């Protein structure tokens, strides 16, 4: 029995990019096509089948532990970027500032799609697995602050639940600008004890 349900929610790819050296700068550089082998985009500093654990999983592993890399690709929505900009009092937030890999348009509340959802290129079959919501960090604030002094600190609150998701490659291939990604969701109910677990 299939465990994933194809939906009619579609995201159109409106921007692609890579961050080639995150030690040098957070910003990403635009691309027309992303090559996506199993380790993620070869040019991307976040690529690799494994990675060193960071603060996001500090309650699970000592920092620097080698773990599976479920953060190969960072994806945000055009709609969420517009809302972030609006709340910050800016005309626009450029995807480069966030160091993202991809911007999609057309999926509502994109940052909150279920973990383990798939984003599948309808034409090529290239498929990304959503790990979880990406959380806003101070590094983006610093990038914005350079261009808009006094504004950067507004990013974290404005980007709450709008920072997109991280994902990893399940089926290799390419995704190009203009591609259509179909959302496939786990066909299961929400765990009834989620609220209790969060408050525990």
Question: Residue spans of the language-model regions?
Answer:
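Electropositive, beta-rich accessory/interaction domains or terminal extensions
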Residues: 1-118, 122, 132, 192-198
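Glycine-rich active-site loops that engage anionic ligands at enzyme catalytic sites
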Residues: 104-108, 112-171
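Short, well-ordered loop/turn sites that connect or cap secondary structure elements
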Residues: 113, 174-177, 181-183
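Short, surface-exposed secondary-structure boundary micro-motifs
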Residues: 124, 133, 180, 186-187
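Short, Lys/Arg- and Gly-enriched loop/turn segments at beta-strand edges
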Residues: 129, 138-140, 187-200
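Acidic/glycine-rich phosphate/pyrophosphate-binding loops and surrounding catalytic core
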Residues: 147, 154-155, 167, 180-185, ...
